[in-house]
């Protein structure tokens, strides 16, 4: 949960389940429960071109005679895409013409896709915006248990992350935050936001596909990672 390697930067942030602490975001902590029944293996991979002189770790675990039958397992899903704007070009807030609605979720950025039973507990969303244009009008859309039409549709990216009015202020809350905001003109540059569904998980019985538009009706080119 450090800044993505493609950014090659570190910074502090604090949330209830995850944190990156001093110094300069190098103290990484995770408080998600990760049940296992037969065994568990934790690996650390150096994906940089630099040697690691020292690595400190600490793991807490609890031994039980038997896990409850309904105990789930913890899963994380990574995705990274350079999205494509509409053929007619980029626009936002209808500046260069009327914007059509997106009713199917086609061409949305996918941040979660899985089969089986479970509940969604959170997302780290990294956006590298190549222009000063506001990146956050894309709606989140959730396809639960094989839905063709999403039953949950949001009202904008910043709304999905519990904020409003195009924020550019660093902020951390136990369940949502903007630990890294762009420092260039408009919204040009890198922004990291998160939201954790601890009190309001999204449940599914058969499958879940979580998506979000990149701009209204997917009209922006954005470098997105989750």
PLM feature segments, named:
Residues 1-226:
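Beta-strand-centric surfaces of beta-sandwich/beta-rich domains
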């Amino acid at each position: 949960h450090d800044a993505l390697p493609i950014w090659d930067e570190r910074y502090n942030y604090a949330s209830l389940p995850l944190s990156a602490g001093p110094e300069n975001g190098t103290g990484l902590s995770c408080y998600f429960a990760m049940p296992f029944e037969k065994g568990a293996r934790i690996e650390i991979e150096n994906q940089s071109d630099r040697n690691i002189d020292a690595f400190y770790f600490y793991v807490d675990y609890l031994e039980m005679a038997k896990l409850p039958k309904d105990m789930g397992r913890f899963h994380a899903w990574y995705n990274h895409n350079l999205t494509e704007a509409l053929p007619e070009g980029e626009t936002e807030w209808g500046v260069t013409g009327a914007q059509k609605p997106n009713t199917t979720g086609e061409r949305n950025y996918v941040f979660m896709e899985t089969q089986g039973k479970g509940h969604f507990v959170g997302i780290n969303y990294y956006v590298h915006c190549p222009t000063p244009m506001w990146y956050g009008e894309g709606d989140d859309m959730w396809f639960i248990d094989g839905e063709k039409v999403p039953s949950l549709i949001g009202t904008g990216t910043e709304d999905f992350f519990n904020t409003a009015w195009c924020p550019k202020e660093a902020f951390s809350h136990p369940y949502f935050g903007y630990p890294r905001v762009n420092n260039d003109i408009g919204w040009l540059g890198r922004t990291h936001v998160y939201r954790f569904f601890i009190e309001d998980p999204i449940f599914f019985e058969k499958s879940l596909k979580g998506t979000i538009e990149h701009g209204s009706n997917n009209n922006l080119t954005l470098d997105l990672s989750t």
